[in-house]
């Protein structure tokens, strides 16, 4: 589930010559933003080093679980009625030895760990908690050492609805530490050093009303899945799939071996607010073939150094981004808290690059270039309609394609000091671009149609921002890099009311 562009050979050659990297391009300008960007979040969710302790005594009416008895938690869960509270004594709790042994909660169960309570999969059991029971709560418990397969998860393995995960430590597992169901709340928890994702928010069914708040999400993708399966798009801190309504706020997302937060395929109505996203090997945020989001008041720094540097060293001319909006935009016909993608009052400091708005001209419903195989836009219920001749005319010409449109980027502060980043080429970009449409042969989007649309016809705007450092701008396609004067002038007319200060930052 990744970018991808398909530049013809001639365009690639031009792009190699035109790419200017971090150097040059900006000039001082006098207009000032109408509203100053907000300050970084004042608190950081430092959950992993100092997790909140659970109760030292069993809550009233709770069933006590003994770590000295293998499988005690699963057995007592099975023999107790729904809505039972379980208190895990201090110590290392285990399941039985079959790899599929797991705890299958009943509706409304509550699991509370005492200080030092650990549920350990011993690198043998695949899953810790599974089943379809709704409204399960897990608090103050460490879950570690489980070996879920790729794309599967350890806690809430079956994506049941209404679970609450609070003050938990989910770490050192394979696969995803945590899956997600509708109305799930993940709060004040540590998702650390898991093999693929901290959380994989995927459900075969409705997944709405997700809250991810006040967590530390760090060090995930220890199994380096992008190297094992190049361009799989299957790793990072958190991956969201077809989530309708999510609040992601107040998290510390750092040091993940890949992307920090990645929403891929028909997500809608996201609020990404007040997070500190830093030091991730890849992008801080990817919002891909999705709709309607607010990204505000985040501090985003030192991201994409690893992936960006590797791409530049390999001669890739694509403007890799710290915030990457790929075939994603505002859509008034889809219900959400906004009908745009609004990116405002964020601080982006010393990342490999800035914000890229991208649209693959060859990626649309029924195209072999659509890496989200079988999926179509949320505007078309019958994918089979997106074929010739109907796709060449309204409304399907518009509705069969995920469009990067109605993106409003304002009141942000963009700081780049290339001596800090250590970049010498192909970094420090903002970008709005597409590729030259070529594929398949029945595509109605061939040529420069999509590049012209995303650049000038789909209401994508930067304005009232502050820039510090040698920023450049990629427009229309990867071969066209311009400086501030051209970016602000005809025909692009971007960053009205913005302030620019050349140099290497404060």
Describe these PLM feature segments.
Residues 8, 19, 54:
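Short, flexible, solvent-exposed loop/turn segments with mixed acidic/basic and small polar residues
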Residues 7-9, 36, 300, 505:
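General helical structural elements
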Residues 1-12:
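N-terminal export and membrane-targeting signals
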Residues 41-506:
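Extracellular parallel beta-helix/beta-solenoid repeat domains
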């Amino acid at each position: 589930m990744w970018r991808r562009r398909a530049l013809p050979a001639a365009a690639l050659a031009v792009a190699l010559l035109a790419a200017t990297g971090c150097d040059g391009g900006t000039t001082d300008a006098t207009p000032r933003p109408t509203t100053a960007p907000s300050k970084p979040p004042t608190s950081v969710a430092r959950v992993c080093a100092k997790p909140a302790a659970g109760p030292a005594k069993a809550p009233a009416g709770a069933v006590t679980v003994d770590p000295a008895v293998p499988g005690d938690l699963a057995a007592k869960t099975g023999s107790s009625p729904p809505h039972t509270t379980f208190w895990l004594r201090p110590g290392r709790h285990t399941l039985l030895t079959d790899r599929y042994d797991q705890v299958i909660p009943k509706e409304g169960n509550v699991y509370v760990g005492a200080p030092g309570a650990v549920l350990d999969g011993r690198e043998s059991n695949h899953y810790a908690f599974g089943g379809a029971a709704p409204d399960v709560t897990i608090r103050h418990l460490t879950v570690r050492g489980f070996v879920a397969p790729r794309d599967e998860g350890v806690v809430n393995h079956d994506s049941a609805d209404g679970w609450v995960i609070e003050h938990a430590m989910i770490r050192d597992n394979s696969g995803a530490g945590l899956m997600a169901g509708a109305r799930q709340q993940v709060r004040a928890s540590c998702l650390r050093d898991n093999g693929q994702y901290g959380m994989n928010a995927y459900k075969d069914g409705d997944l709405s009303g997700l809250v991810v708040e006040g967590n530390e999400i760090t060090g995930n993708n220890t199994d380096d899945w992008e190297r094992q399966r190049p361009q799989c798009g299957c790793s990072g801190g958190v991956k969201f799939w077809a989530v309708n309504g999510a609040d992601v706020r107040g998290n510390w997302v750092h040091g993940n071996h890949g992307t920090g937060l990645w929403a891929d395929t028909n997500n809608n109505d996201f609020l990404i607010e007040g997070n500190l996203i830093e030091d991730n090997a890849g992008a801080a945020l990817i919002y891909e073939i999705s709709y309607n989001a607010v990204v505000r008041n985040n501090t985003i720094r030192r991201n994409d150094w690893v992936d960006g540097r590797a791409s530049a060293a390999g001669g890739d001319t694509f403007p890799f981004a710290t915030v990457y909006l790929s075939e994603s935009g505002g859509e008034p016909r889809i219900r959400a808290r906004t009908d745009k993608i609004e990116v405002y009052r964020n601080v982006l400091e010393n990342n490999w690059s800035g914000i890229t708005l991208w649209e693959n001209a060859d990626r649309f419903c029924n195209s072999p270039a659509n890496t989200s195989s079988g999926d179509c836009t949320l505007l078309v219920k019958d994918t089979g309609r997106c074929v010739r001749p109907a796709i060449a005319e309204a409304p399907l010409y518009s509705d069969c394609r995920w469009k990067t449109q109605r993106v409003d980027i304002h009141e942000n502060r963009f700081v780049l000091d290339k001596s800090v980043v250590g970049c010498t080429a192909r970094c420090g970009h903002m970008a709005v671009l597409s590729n030259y449409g070529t594929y398949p042969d029945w595509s109605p989007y061939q040529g420069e149609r999509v590049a012209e649309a995303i650049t000038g016809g789909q209401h994508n705007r930067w304005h009232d921002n502050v820039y510090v450092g040698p920023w450049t701008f990629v427009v229309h396609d990867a071969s066209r890099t311009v400086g501030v004067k051209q970016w602000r002038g005809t025909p692009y007319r971007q960053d009205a009311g913005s302030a620019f200060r050349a140099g290497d930052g404060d």
